[in-house]
Structure formats: structure tokens, C-alpha cells
């Protein structure tokens, strides 16, 4: 369904940007018997319900004219929340100095899950400061090994 999400991104991005917001993510997923088109938006200071309703209405209108999806589905426009996904270079760059959660395809230093402060990011490598018991360690993770990355809330 990557083709669907790419087409929806192309349709949604100008709509979202015209309203002064950022398109964070588009997912098309099946849950039980139902399909959901989830669109995450954000802006400085965060989005509110009115922002989500506004984008939902405008995107729904655009999808009614040029819908790349054949199946019936529910459109859900929302904030990415506190644990925002990190997918694009800009996402990682904005997250430098913040607490993140990283899951890798293959083990790095004998682990596939990491949580810590993002210190640096480049197209090839990122560096995390993680806490192991009472010590802080720096770990380099190749970007091509990242399966999933998101901001993490610290309690």
C-alpha cells in the first residue's frame, strides 16, 4: 500500500502547508475488517481539534475528486502526539537533544531497541547517549538499520 500513501501524501501536503502546518505522516492500515487512512499534522505550538477538522474537511473534499483508494475507509486526521514518529531528515534534525526510541532491523551492539538522547544525525549515522545502569554510553546506529524511530516521553 506504499503507492496509496505516496499518492495521498502528494495530495495532502499542499493542503496542509497552505494552512501553515506540516504533514508528518500518512498511513493506510487495516484494523479488523476496516481500513483507516491516518494523516498526522503538526505546527509550532501544536495542533488543536479545529485544525484537524479543517484539514479533514479539505482533504476529504480533495479525495472525493481524486481518490487513489479503491476500498471504503475512514479518514482520520490527528496530531502525531508526544511520541511523534521520526521519518525524514528534518524530523531527526529537530529531535537532536531530545529523548528518542529507536528500533533496528538488525542488532547493533547486541541490541535492537534503544532509548536515549539523540546527540547527532547524518544521512548515514546517528549517535545516541543511552543509560546502562549508572553509566552513560554513546552508541552509533547506522541509519539504514533503523526500522522505526520516534520521540519518547521520559517519566
UniProtKB/Swiss-Prot annotation:
<comment type="function">
    <text>Required for maturation of 30S ribosomal subunits.</text>
</comment>
<dbReference type="GO" id="GO:0000028">
    <property type="term" value="P:ribosomal small subunit assembly"/>
</dbReference>
<dbReference type="InterPro" id="IPR028989">
    <property type="entry name" value="RimP_N"/>
</dbReference>
<dbReference type="InterPro" id="IPR036847">
    <property type="entry name" value="RimP_C_sf"/>
</dbReference>
<dbReference type="InterPro" id="IPR028998">
    <property type="entry name" value="RimP_C"/>
</dbReference>
<dbReference type="GO" id="GO:0005829">
    <property type="term" value="C:cytosol"/>
</dbReference>
<dbReference type="InterPro" id="IPR003728">
    <property type="entry name" value="Ribosome_maturation_RimP"/>
</dbReference>
<keyword id="KW-0963">Cytoplasm</keyword>
<dbReference type="Pfam" id="PF02576">
    <property type="entry name" value="RimP_N"/>
</dbReference>
<dbReference type="InterPro" id="IPR035956">
    <property type="entry name" value="RimP_N_sf"/>
</dbReference>
<dbReference type="Pfam" id="PF17384">
    <property type="entry name" value="DUF150_C"/>
</dbReference>
<comment type="similarity">
    <text>Belongs to the RimP family.</text>
</comment>
<keyword id="KW-0690">Ribosome biogenesis</keyword>
<protein>
    <recommendedName>
        <fullName>Ribosome maturation factor RimP</fullName>
    </recommendedName>
</protein>
<dbReference type="GO" id="GO:0006412">
    <property type="term" value="P:translation"/>
</dbReference>
